[in-house]
Amino acid sequence: MLLEKSKIEIIEQFIHILEILEMYAKEGSDEKAIIRLMLDYLEKGYVLDDDILPIASKISEIAKKVGSFDMKREISLLLFGERKRLTKSQKNKIKKIIEILEYLKSYIEKKPYKSYEDKLILNLIGLKILRLDNGIVLDYNSEVRSLTNMALRVGSYELKNEIELLLTGRRRRKLTEEFIQKRLSIIKILEMVKDFIDKKEFKSSFDYEALFLINLKIYRIEEGILKNFDEEIESILNIARKVGNHKLREQIVLLKESIKN
């Protein structure tokens, strides 16, 4: 894969990976010193063609010592993975995964407080997007599983399940008038909860996750991927219990009953 790129692209990729690894190498360690020497060498641009594979191997070796399991795998795939020929359908699926990764990245970046795990996942997302953009793709189910596991590490089971449903759920082909009306009604309720959160002067971590979750739900429902009506409403009520008040929950229940009738 590396040999298919220009030397400038390769050097930029090496620098990007090393800068990430530098965050995890202990101060005073051999790995930290080697990373700094390699960055200094690469930034000067004096890289010979014969140096490329040995440098890639050294970066991979450092990743094994200082990176997490997921990071080691992403870096190894990025450096040595094979670009795959994808069908139009496969390209669209990967495009959707990249889109959700970008959404997840934006959600983490908006958190008022970022944990060590949040920062780690942000770096993983960056590496994963870079890999997928380069056409280095695992099978679809593995990519989905990796993404949903990351979502769980920075959010809730509900967030994980929502992303999984969006990426693997079946889209309704035949849209009846009743289905269309229920879909519009659910989106209207979600927009109401979103508006309630947006108006808060101070937002908690629950609020930020709820906003992300609502946007995913709206996206999924607009794509025609729906659970049954009662499940969808109960899921919205669960969000309202975390971020809303009694009045908001009451409004949701009243809207639910009016739609059913």
UniProtKB/Swiss-Prot annotation:
Q: What is this protein called?
A: Uncharacterized protein MJ0602
Q: What is the species of this protein?
A: Methanocaldococcus jannaschii (strain ATCC 43067 / DSM 2661 / JAL-1 / JCM 10045 / NBRC 100440) (Methanococcus jannaschii)
